Amino acid sequence: MVLRQLSRQASVKVGKTWTGTKKRAQRIFIFILELLLEFCRGEDSVDGKNKSTTALPAVKDSVKDS
């Protein structure tokens, strides 16, 4: 009887701990995804200005004709 009660209490405690761990892991995962998305969009600068998203400068018309 006492052993069964202790077993139930332990399983409830583990269940609550696991639920909290899953929620925390989800929040961390979402934070990392949002950070990665901002970085890919170029919104990760310290001054709040967006970075240029183009890797190369635009090609001028005179260069394209050559």
UniProtKB/Swiss-Prot annotation:
- Phosphothreonine modification sites are T21
Give the stretches traversing the membrane: 28-44
InterPro entries recorded: Polyoma_agno
Please provide one cellular component term from the Gene Ontology annotations of this protein.
host cell plasma membrane
Residue spans, topological domain Cytoplasmic: 1-27
PTM characteristics: Phosphorylated by host PKC. Phosphorylation alters the stability and may also have an impact on the subcellular location.
The entry lists its GO molecular-function terms as:
channel activity; DNA binding
UniProt cross-references to Pfam families, sorted A to Z: Polyoma_agno
Q: Where is the signal peptide?
A: none
Q: Alphabetically list the UniProt keywords.
A: Host cell membrane, Host cytoplasm, Host endoplasmic reticulum, Host membrane, Host nucleus, Host-virus interaction, Ion channel, Ion transport, Membrane, Phosphoprotein, Signal-anchor, Transmembrane, Transmembrane helix, Transport, Viral ion channel
One of the GO BP terms on file: monoatomic ion transmembrane transport
Q: Which residues carry this modification: Phosphoserine?
A: S7, S11
**Segments on the Extracellular side according to the record's topology features:** 45-66
Where would you find this protein in the cell? Host cytoplasm; Host nucleus membrane; Host rough endoplasmic reticulum membrane; Host cell membrane
**Bilayer topology annotation:** Single-pass type II membrane protein
Q: Which family does it belong to?
A: Belongs to the polyomavirus agnoprotein family.
Under the subunit heading, UniProt states: Homooligomer. Interacts with VP1. Interacts with large T antigen; this interaction may impact upon the activity of T-antigen on the control of viral gene transcription and replication. Interacts with small t antigen. Interacts with host CBX5; this interaction induces the dissociation of CBX5 from LBR, resulting in destabilization of the nuclear envelope.
Q: Any idea what job this protein has?
A: Alters the structure of the nuclear envelope by interacting with host CBX5 and disrupting CBX5 association with LBR. Involved in the perinuclear-nuclear localization of the capsid protein VP1 during virion assembly and maturation. Plays an important role in the release of progeny virions from infected cells and in viral propagation, probably by acting as a viral ionic channel in the host plasma membrane. Allows influx of extracellular calcium ions in the host cell. May contribute to viral genome transcription and translation of viral late proteins.
Name of this protein: Agnoprotein
Q: Give the originating organism.
A: BK polyomavirus (BKPyV)
